[in-house]
Amino acid sequence: MPVIPALWEVEMGRSQGQEIETILANRSHSDSTPLPNFLSGSHRPECCTCRLLTASGAQDSLPFGRRLYSGPWRSCEEVCHVSVLSVLSTSCGLSLSLPIFPGWMEWLSPDIALPRRDEWTQTSPARKRITHAKVQGAGQLRLSIDAQDRVLLLHIIEGKGLISKQPGTCDPYVKISLIPEDSRLRHQKTQTVPDCRDPAFHEHFFFPVQEEDDQKRLLVTVWNRASQSRQSGLIGCMSFGVKSLLTPDKEISGWYYLLGEHLGRTKHLKVARRRLRPLRDPLLRMPGGGDTENGKKLKITIPRGKDGFGFTICCDSPVRVQAVDSGGPAERAGLQQLDTVLQLNERPVEHWKCVELAHEIRSCPSEIILLVWRMVPQVKPGPDGGVLRRASCKSTHDLQSPPNKREKNCTHGVQARPEQRHSCHLVCDSSDGLLLGGWERYTEVAKRGGQHTLPALSRATAPTDPNYIILAPLNPGSQLLRPVYQEDTIPEESGSPSKGKSYTGLGKKSRLMKTVQTMKGHGNYQNCPVVRPHATHSSYGTYVTLAPKVLVFPVFVQPLDLCNPARTLLLSEELLLYEGRNKAAEVTLFAYSDLLLFTKEDEPGRCDVLRNPLYLQSVKLQEGSSEDLKFCVLYLAEKAECLFTLEAHSQEQKKRVCWCLSENIAKQQQLAASPPDSKMFETEADEKREMALEEGKGPGAEDSPPSKEPSPGQELPPGQDLPPNKDSPSGQEPAPSQEPLSSKDSATSEGSPPGPDAPPSKDVPPCQEPPPAQDLSPCQDLPAGQEPLPHQDPLLTKDLPAIQESPTRDLPPCQDLPPSQVSLPAKALTEDTMSSGDLLAATGDPPAAPRPAFVIPEVRLDSTYSQKAGAEQGCSGDEEDAEEAEEVEEGEEGEEDEDEDTSDDNYGERSEAKRSSMIETGQGAEGGLSLRVQNSLRRRTHSEGSLLQEPRGPCFASDTTLHCSDGEGAASTWGMPSPSTLKKELGRNGGSMHHLSLFFTGHRKMSGADTVGDDDEASRKRKSKNLAKDMKNKLGIFRRRNESPGAPPAGKADKMMKSFKPTSEEALKWGESLEKLLVHKYGLAVFQAFLRTEFSEENLEFWLACEDFKKVKSQSKMASKAKKIFAEYIAIQACKEVNLDSYTREHTKDNLQSVTRGCFDLAQKRIFGLMEKDSYPRFLRSDLYLDLINQKKMSPPL
């Protein structure tokens, strides 16, 4: 088929354009008559585009109608095939689109082809990934669209950063129309704003919409009315589907990108809110905004030199100077690093991208004139009479790093909490000390006057602002990070000391690894945030990453002392971590000589620690087959084995990592082996051996002032380990937050914190006599890395929960308990790693006396757990305590409704992952407060926002070992569950035979001959050899026990057991819809139990809370309950935040201004749909549901 030439040069003007249409309409394929003069010759940039459409195989071309649209067009030349039509599209600046028959208009995009429906009527086009670079150039338009009675109400508010493709001034106006539309009578437009790239329109328009217009689109275009030409130029456009605008819940309001012609006619794109967030940092604010006290404008003329202008740029909107060549033209002209470019040759460029500005600068032949904005350091009086100097620049590494793609933790209009602040402070006191903001990654000192070294760091006094951590003194001698290289492959940036540089400086080629650890409200956090591990001396080859990483420890991760010379970084490898069966995540594994750190590199050079460290002495390695790239790391968590599945990228990497891990695991387990003479100190409670602590306190540190709060522990250096005491067979000290358990000596030993004269070198530190009964001693569950002040007496430490700021729920202090309830054998704690000599050199204060060892009381089990007390009280005491624990938990906010029973700490031990015990308060047998340990599922993984407000201790969902455990030789036993525990758990899990057999037989690996019962009756039955009688007696708890009139009323577990268990036919009906499942009481309980195992129960809890909210009648109660639901489930970083989009969150927030019963309807509908698509199908495939529908007819109760 012959092809008609599609590119002719034409003169601008309406009459010539009409003449083109006439000529082309009368010209056929075979016509060889010459074209007019204005249609021949070389084309100029002003030429038009003619779209020629011919039918395949047709001899004559179809007639063309009048011209419909003119505007700028991207240069393209491509033949597209749609159905039987061949389309040749060529453009060189302006577009002339011609229809082939009335009512059909084809605006074909070169990269979008719609197979059956034209793109005018395509209401839901196929999704296409749009990068931010494609939509950043033309500018943005702010508008709002509302619909009332089939009338569209448009409010064109303002524009921003409008950039026209034509040179000269920009005179913008906005044009609105419905497409496709033949009549021009319905086109509306705003007034023209002369010479303004940020125009303010504030005009309203009304568009009545008929039923036949539902398939059309509302087109909003922004034009530039050029003064030197009659033809306007298109700046950008966007379009909205009319049918979607008429829906009641559709809301169009805010900033939208101006897209290109092809893209804008089919879709619209809203500017993300994170890109509109007001920038708090003075450096990141839009320059030139009248903030003259923080900066100034400078006009700099830079001539082109031999090698260019002599500077590099970075960042987008605005562009900043990244580096200035020493001695180059830019430096001689006065340009400095981090200057913000406002204008280039008197042309505004603050909204330009870096690539565009670089291309424009390169095209300048002789010189450039820059208008730049330069930050002026702001000096303010700081705490303690020092000088507070806000950082006037980012580090070079920050500028090279790309911006965050997703900022989930941004708070809009809400003051951030101290642990969420992103402030960056440099505080210099009289001793030239440095303090660093709590969450800032790191701050580097800019190059000033040839200074390449850091000022001398010293121990500064704690500021009043809690959002500070103090940099510990640095020893620049032997703690430099030197990656492992082979002798012949040492790169230039390796930082070799042989070059004679001072490596305390922050030059371009020497970056230090720094560890930022959060404050959580403590002003004297002394745990050395600048980490410089010493050089490794391993033989595992070249596999330490070349660039140092910034390790960030979140609030839920146990901080580490990586400065310890006994700890060596062996390797750093990028591996795949399998979180589920098919879900894998890219992680960076840091293997030290004694532990493993799993991190995720969200940004280049920045690694967020995902979980608490795994100590090598408590892990095992399974390499698997040699052909498979996967290998497993097993670890102990509450006497159950858990594992991580890792996958290497190559066989060499797997062999390297496995070799390193297996060798060092063997070393650490050999070092952690208990000495033979320590066996004499082991008790019968060997199955409850406490976790050993790596992070202790070393001797020789001075006392903390009485006004300071607790400081976290640091790593115990070699040579300062205390001798093993009788409760720590492995020679390790217990964690301050891990209260070890014991069940043997509960009736014979008591204890309280020792006096200051307790010597730290004893195996068993002496304990004072217990205080009087009316005095209280704190028994608080502290987070990891914190401890009470050792030098305070009980009266002072009694007020510790009131002054401590921590996300952990502060428990009230417990009273002095009788020996049958609590016993407190002493635990010696090591002291700070810094010697008094270092403190003397740092602060200038005289050395203080060595701090006496602080004895941490060991939390024993109360009468509910004690074997002897259990023998005296029996089953009734267990049930009474269980019901009291439920009543306490029901009254607490933020707690889950159903917790595991506290009367049995050995319930349900399996080989899958379990979570650590928590300490809770409850009523003791004699009315006093007591401590009880429950093994409930407390940790959450649904969002990172919830981890910051978790009411429990600092923990992570995948974390099951807060500290290193004792060794592998710990004997483990399985005990028969108590009746109340059995009833509660069987009622929760549906009473399947699998759970029933698991309760009475236990795990094969855990069961043994010396199982410990709950009471004397259970012990007697266990000794008997008649298994049938044993089972009959145990199953007797399912009878209605009306024979005990003095027994307490039945709790929630009894009510659940009395509920009707559905048949398999009823359970099958649950698979028809989620509504039928939630209506059934038993189905709701089973579904909630399933979601708890999936760590997504917050969705159902939110849905149930909304259902309860609709039943509230009082308006005052409704308002308070609505705020509580929003703060707990919907607010950003809520403790149980559900997965909602930003529109639903903002819509619900607006509804709270006037609270009604339906203010949560949209959010509840979204969560219901999420459960219906995600959780509900998984529940139908779960073993729990399959057991219910496949259950056999059970025998009647005995």
Swiss-Prot record:
Location of the region described as Disordered in the Swiss-Prot/TrEMBL record: 669-933, 1007-1026, 1032-1056
Ranges of compositional bias, category Pro residues: 753-773
Residues where Omega-N-methylarginine is found: 448
Residues modified to Phosphoserine: 674, 943, 946, 978, 1007
Stretches assigned to the PDZ domain: 299-376
Polar residues composition-biased segments: 739-751
Comp. bias (Basic and acidic residues): 679-697, 907-917
PTM: Phosphorylated by cyclic GMP-dependent protein kinase.
Annotated InterPro entries: C2_dom (IPR000008), C2_domain_sf (IPR035892), PDZ (IPR001478), PDZ_sf (IPR036034), PH-like_dom_sf (IPR011993), RGS (IPR016137), RGS_RGS3 (IPR034951), RGS_sf (IPR036305)
RGS domain location: 1073-1198
Complexes and interactors: Binds EFNB1 and EFNB2. Binds the GNB1-GNG2 heterodimer.
Protein name: Regulator of G-protein signaling 3
UniProt source species: Homo sapiens
